[in-house]
Amino acid sequence: MKLRGKKIVVLVADGFEDLEYWVTVMRLREEGAEVISVGPGEGPFHGKNYLEARADATANDVDAGELDGIVIPGGWAPDKLRRYEEVTDLVAAVHERDKTVGIICHGGLVAISAGIVNGVSATGSLGIKDDLVNAGATWVDKPAFRENDLVWGRVVPDIPDFCRELVAALSEG
């Protein structure tokens, strides 16, 4: 169990990408991590494909200094989550502490609003390529990769690669 003792937030809101959320949560738990689902309220939140998830806490309830990482799954949820300053502040605070930030698919929208993509390489859903580039990122069309504390994943079929990179980064941090 590579992540025993690690505390990791996974963001959730209505419209989350079911597999990007649930596979990542299960993979982190499988490695022994304490996973805290954070959303704008308790939920239940409904995924794009109708799976449900509940939040354990809101962003205001979580101390970035106690976290080893944060994950931003895709779907439509990132467009909602980026509107909550407490969410973008939490993402920025985790990044400022050089802790792992995992971003897949449309999760880059939250990273943009958190101000953490300028000058970095990034990937995600092709639908947000222009957003990432306009925010100062360099687009990289790869399934998943790591750059410093940022772990990027493209889309649903790339979840295995994303989770592999994410677990590796979290186990080193």
Please provide the spans of the model-predicted regions:
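Extended, subdomain-level signal for the structured scaffold at the beginning of enzyme domains
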Residues: 1-97, 101, 110-121, 129-173
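Catalytic nucleophile serine of serine hydrolases
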Residues: 105
